[in-house]
Amino acid sequence: MGQSKKLNKQPRSLSPLVLLSGISKSFDGKEVISQLDLTINNGEFLTLLGPSGCGKTTVLRLIAGLETVDAGHIMLDNQDITHVPAENRYVNTVFQSYALFPHMTVFENVAFGLRMQKTPAAEIAPRVTDALRMVQLEEFAQRKPHQLSGGQQQRVAIARAVVNKPRLLLLDESLSALDYKLRKQMQNELKALQRKLGITFVFVTHDQEEALTMSDRIVVMRNGVIEQDGTPREIYEEPKNLFVAGFIGEINRFDATVIERLDEQRVRASVEGRECNIYVNFAVELGQKLNVLLRPEDLRVEEINDDNHIEGLIGYVRERNYKGMTLESVVELENGKMVMVSEFFNEDDPDFDHSLDQKMAISWVESWEVVLADEEHK
């Protein structure tokens, strides 16, 4: 988002494991994936993120071999697997429902895949024990699924998937059935397990916080196409368009109009009716409409108690929400636009707990803003 928040974009020297090239897929005449290209690297935790119906689960099912492509190719470890049956792909999937066999013990559930592959009997017990030890369920080996918590069942499903030593593990919304506290715990455990195993994980979710917490890389999808592909920080701090900006966390969008270019980096603009300097790294014209994007935590607010010269936008506190570590305020600008501001709680600041209807000045550190061309006026 600019100078002091500039991201370190060293090239990632990872080797590709999966290549999707020109993938298209339709159901009942409706195209759900359109000419999609995606590289998944060895050993990374990649998340496919997007709203319901964006095509993320279809991509997962195409990689797994549970659906067939209409066009394009899928490569795994330099082998074309586009038409290889699912059972021969060295890819395992953990579904939202876990689908454990209720009549089998935990041990038997994990061993099932090995027996189906006709693994020598002498290998089965040590491999199952190793897999259960990895997910910290060794002592639960003789229990039935109904005797386990939701989080434990989820770990059994993962152990069953990794015991076959897949090159790739696919997880389809596999934490969504858990309660909030257990989800948070499982996010940390899943990421730690992925690091320990060194297996490539591809995780599908619509939960932005989950994606930011767990991923090495996030692929944001909408209507069957990739909107942005980057690290969690890149996606959060440097969104490429308004959809990504609005989908990942809270963000304020300000309307701006170019007044003049000041230098190579900065433009003088009218932002919601107030003149400000903004950082714009693309060519603009006089009078051009822009979008200025700022996260609530990137805004600074100051109470106005006199008529001294005021920098920034002017508004009035309309709502306050105490969130423990932060105080979130809704400020109404003079033109009626509502702005969200998030401040870290500071009980030693006498002006911190703002009164309703208090007049405020809103500003930000120059260059922390993201500026995008107005998509409606290109």
Curated annotation (Swiss-Prot):
Pfam families documented for this protein? ABC_tran, TOBE_2
Mode of membrane association = Peripheral membrane protein
Known EC number: 7.6.2.11
Under the heading SMART domains, the entry gives: AAA
Q: Which UniProt keyword terms apply here?
A: ATP-binding, Cell inner membrane, Cell membrane, Membrane, Nucleotide-binding, Translocase, Transport
Spell out the InterPro entries in the cross-references.
AAA+_ATPase, ABC_SmlMolc_Importer, ABC_transporter-like_ATP-bd, ABC_transporter-like_CS, Mo/tungstate-bd_C_term_dom, P-loop_NTPase, PotA-like, PotA_ATP-bd
Catalytic activities: ATP + H2O + polyamine-[polyamine-binding protein]Side 1 = ADP + phosphate + polyamineSide 2 + [polyamine-binding protein]Side 1
The UniProt record lists the ABC transporter domain at 18-248
Q: Which major enzyme category is it?
A: translocase
Entry annotated with the keyword NAD: no
| Main localization, broad class | membrane
* Residues annotated to bind ATP: 50-57
Tell me where in or outside the cell this protein is found: Cell inner membrane
Is Heme tagged as a keyword? no
Q: Please give an example of a GO cellular component term from this record.
A: ATP-binding cassette (ABC) transporter complex
Q: Name one GO molecular function term.
A: ABC-type putrescine transporter activity
Where exactly are the transmembrane stretches of this chain?
Answer: none
Self-association and partners: The complex is composed of two ATP-binding proteins (PotA), two transmembrane proteins (PotB and PotC) and a solute-binding protein (PotD).
Q: Which family does it belong to?
A: Belongs to the ABC transporter superfamily. Spermidine/putrescine importer (TC 3.A.1.11.1) family.
Role this protein plays: Part of the ABC transporter complex PotABCD involved in spermidine/putrescine import. Responsible for energy coupling to the transport system.
This protein is called: Spermidine/putrescine import ATP-binding protein PotA
- Species the sequence originates in: Salmonella typhi
Its taxonomic path starts at:
Bacteria, Pseudomonadati, Pseudomonadota, Gammaproteobacteria, Enterobacterales
